[in-house]
């Protein structure tokens, strides 16, 4: 019985890791498709500000907004 429970837990952990990797790859692909921009680049605001992962759009002035960490 302990062996079965251990195998089930191990399977669940492996599945969770595989799902996390797949999700991360999917997010990276989505960022490329929507035209994310890197640090200190002007925010891509055609459909709302889109900065790459870990960055956020910071409004420096009325006319200038940049992606910053």
Curated annotation (Swiss-Prot):
<protein>
    <recommendedName>
        <fullName>U5-agatoxin-Ao1a</fullName>
    </recommendedName>
</protein>
<dbReference type="GO" id="GO:0005576">
    <property type="term" value="C:extracellular region"/>
</dbReference>
<keyword id="KW-0964">Secreted</keyword>
<keyword id="KW-0732">Signal</keyword>
<feature type="disulfide bond">
    <location>
        <begin position="36"/>
        <end position="52"/>
    </location>
</feature>
<keyword id="KW-0027">Amidation</keyword>
<dbReference type="Pfam" id="PF05980">
    <property type="entry name" value="Toxin_7"/>
</dbReference>
<feature type="propeptide">
    <location>
        <begin position="21"/>
        <end position="34"/>
    </location>
</feature>
<keyword id="KW-1015">Disulfide bond</keyword>
<dbReference type="GO" id="GO:0090729">
    <property type="term" value="F:toxin activity"/>
</dbReference>
<feature type="disulfide bond">
    <location>
        <begin position="43"/>
        <end position="57"/>
    </location>
</feature>
<comment type="similarity">
    <text>Belongs to the neurotoxin 01 (U2-agtx) family.</text>
</comment>
<feature type="signal peptide">
    <location>
        <begin position="1"/>
        <end position="20"/>
    </location>
</feature>
<keyword id="KW-0800">Toxin</keyword>
